[in-house]
Amino acid sequence: YRANGGVSPINEQNRALLAALKQALAERGPRIPIVWANRNWDPYVSDVLQQAYEEGHRNILVLATSAYPGYSSCRQYREDYGVALQKLGLHGQMRVDKIRQFFDTPGFVQAFADGLQDGLKQVQEQVAARHADGTAAAGNGRIRIMFCTHSVPTSAANEAGPRGIDYEGGSAYVEKHLQVARAVLAWVQEHHESLLDNTDW
């Protein structure tokens, strides 16, 4: 927050996403209106639903910008819309559906694969330059790849996904992150295998 002037960067990122989606739909269709709603900040879900209803819209499709499964990234959104419909007296008069989580879609995974590829190239160039001028850093000479994500409490992660399934890492939230990490590494290995020489993850 400090690096962004005391505000969350997410609203500005959502405005940029909204503009990009509007442009893409204007160019390719379908020609449908797109609006933006927030759970915890203006514009609030209930206000946006009320306005959409007043403008004659009866079917709403929600895209939550959180890619992975979990209570706060999936079910809580559904609950928020359900509560808003009840509060506004619109239950049964307006339908709200939500797009599935997108952690495993090619475009999402590819962005991270491209980032890892570019990052490995840069780090390897920096390491080579330091070796060339005799200022090599301490260590074993291997590059450690670390995948990190939004932190959620273990109890919240454990609430992600159906019960009775033996998820890798203990929850669907952890398992899906591991699947994406492996898919990213597999893409780099397939297309630029030498970049993974002398790396650990």
Regions found by a protein language model. Name each.
Residues 1-201:
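Active-site-proximal alpha-helix that buttresses catalytic centers in soluble enzyme cores
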